[in-house]
Amino acid sequence: MTKKIAVINDLSGFGRCSLTAAISVISAMGIQACPLPTAILTAQTGYPHYYLDDYTDKMDIYRQEWQKMGQHFDGIYTGFVASEAQIDQIFHFIDTFYTSDTFLLVDPVMG
């Protein structure tokens, strides 16, 4: 059975980072990356200007739908957090899906 990692991170149009990089690397390892976007950005925050579409209100929808599907994850990886409110969403996600067999990797990036 293919291992799965929930990847909680942003998607940036420019910048070679976040979900764009994580999905590629995780997939190359033969693991299914299951992205849960925290935000969609026109470019990563290191650019002089960018547009950020905050996904805080959508994060719990992902959690609920994946829970209804009976999904489980071998790993949970968190990256860019767009707002303080997302921290609570991430804790709720971890409370739902984390088990003693789940690898948890927290990259403390908060924009």
What is each PLM-predicted segment?
Residues 1-74:
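Small-residue (G/A/S/T)-rich helix-start motifs and N-terminal tracts that mark the onset
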